[in-house]
Curated annotation (Swiss-Prot):
InterPro entries: Pes-10. The gene is pes-10. GO terms for cellular component: cytoplasm; nucleus. It comes from the Eukaryota. Pfam families: Pes-10. It is found in: Nucleus; Cytoplasm. In the embryo, expressed in newly arisen somatic blastomeres. This is Patterned expression site protein 10. It comes from Caenorhabditis elegans. Belongs to the Pes-10 family.
Length: 407
């Protein structure tokens, strides 16, 4: 662990103390430090600040800087991402139900470029009038009439279908008069259809090739690997679009929309890096903390993050203990706050080491009381940590007795 990584761990833990007197000076101290986005992303600082230091100006400034940085990167990726999404959808001869619903839902996020791309896709899908009505596509296209060619094309297509339906209704009477002739012709068609079915059964390889599906026998291993690679890339890009949709729905603040988006996108199955990239945890704090599904997703993200940095937390703890207590004769209040954090979220090793320090060092009663260490001791149920915790309780009680006798 290098110095930058160590200091970012220290900053993250300091923000969790909720202590403005510790948070502000440390952020000021680190203001000129050059830190990579990967390290900042790892600690999810916007979400940390939203939860633990929402009113601290220095922390708010840090969060804002990180969000601006990330949004700039997302903006640079957006054009390529939308172009590829359009390609993926248009490559399908028949749109998948999921992609159809995703595309039709994205137009409601009020993002001009995103809506333009989705209208372009929708035109290629060749939807029915019922679909245009069910997904509210025509109504949305009317909002952009004259502003984008894709919206005008949808309006034109719908008008043409409506006109065609009028002609069909006028011809309905004539069609009814020819029912007997139609029934006779259908008998002949059934025989022809059966022959076509038999032909398709015998020429299944041709039908598969025409639909864009190739068997392993038709492809050599390199071609097959390339197809699989492209498929994986396409799936990854669709996942990015899903995160755009989920983020937009959370920003709406509407509980029903948030729950529906979490369920529709399968948000719990996406990798941590993608959830962090689109600041899903941060957005939940800002717009969706009132929603049970969003809260479950937020806790899920926290769990994934704890697993990811578990090894680094161990390394940070060892470095912190070594640098803090190498020649220390006393324990400062800020160190007490950090140590209490190890009691709250540390593993057995961290907790035991922390309790050893509390037993060994000359810590005052007021320091124990102000840091609320005793509350953490109640959660120690068994093992070495529980034994050390009992000993620390005895130490605190002894300090209380001495303090009482003095007064």
């Amino acid at each position: 662990m290098n110095k930058n990584e160590y200091m970012m761990h220290l900053l993250a833990r300091t923000i969790r103390t909720r202590n403005d007197d510790m948070i502000t000076p440390l952020i000021t101290q680190l203001a000129d430090m050059q830190v990579s986005m990967d390290i900042l992303e790892k600690h999810n600082f916007p979400a940390l600040v939203a939860e633990y230091a929402p009113f601290n100006k220095a922390a708010q400034s840090l969060s804002h800087s990180v969000l601006v940085w990330k949004n700039d990167e997302l903006a640079q990726e957006k054009s390529y991402m939308l172009k590829e999404f359009v390609r993926i959808c248009k490559d399908q001869h028949q749109p998948e139900e999921f992609l159809l619903r995703l595309t039709c839902s994205l137009i409601n996020l009020n993002d001009f470029e995103l809506t333009r791309s989705c209208f372009d896709i929708i035109v290629s899908f060749g939807l029915t009038l019922n679909a245009y009505d069910e997904f509210g596509i025509f109504r949305k296209a009317m909002e952009y009439q004259g502003q984008m060619e894709e919206a005008d094309k949808i309006i034109s297509d719908v008008d043409a279908m409506l006109l065609r339906n009028e002609f069909l209704e006028e011809d309905e009477a004539e069609e009814q008069a020819d029912n007997e002739m139609d029934a006779f012709e259908e008998e002949g068609v059934e025989e022809v259809d059966q022959e076509v079915v038999d032909f398709n059964d015998n020429e299944s390889v041709i039908s598969e090739t025409e639909s864009g599906v190739f068997t392993d026998e038709e492809l050599d291993m390199e071609d097959h690997a390339e197809v699989m690679r492209r498929h994986a890339q396409d799936q990854a890009l669709v996942s990015e679009i899903c995160m755009v949709f989920l983020a937009g729905c959370i920003k709406s603040g509407r509980s029903d929309v948030i729950s529906a988006a979490i369920q529709f996108t399968g948000a719990f199955f996406y990798p941590l890096a993608l959830l962090r990239k689109y600041d899903i945890q941060y957005l939940i704090y800002c717009y969706g903390s009132h929603n049970e599904d969003a809260e479950l997703l937020m806790n899920h993200i926290k769990h994934l993050q704890a697993i990811e940095i578990a090894g680094e937390r161990q390394e940070f703890f060892k470095m912190f203990m070594e640098t803090t207590f190498r020649n220390a004769e006393t324990v400062t209040d800020s160190v007490m706050a950090q140590m209490k954090g190890f009691l709250e979220d540390g593993d057995d090793f961290m907790i035991s080491c922390t309790l050893h320090v509390f037993l060994k060092m000359p810590i005052t009663l007021s320091q124990f009381k102000n840091s609320h260490v005793e509350a953490c001791l109640e959660n120690l149920e068994s093992g070495l940590a529980a034994q050390l915790g009992f000993m620390l309780k005895m130490k605190i009680q002894l300090l209380e007795q001495i303090d009482y006798e003095i007064w």
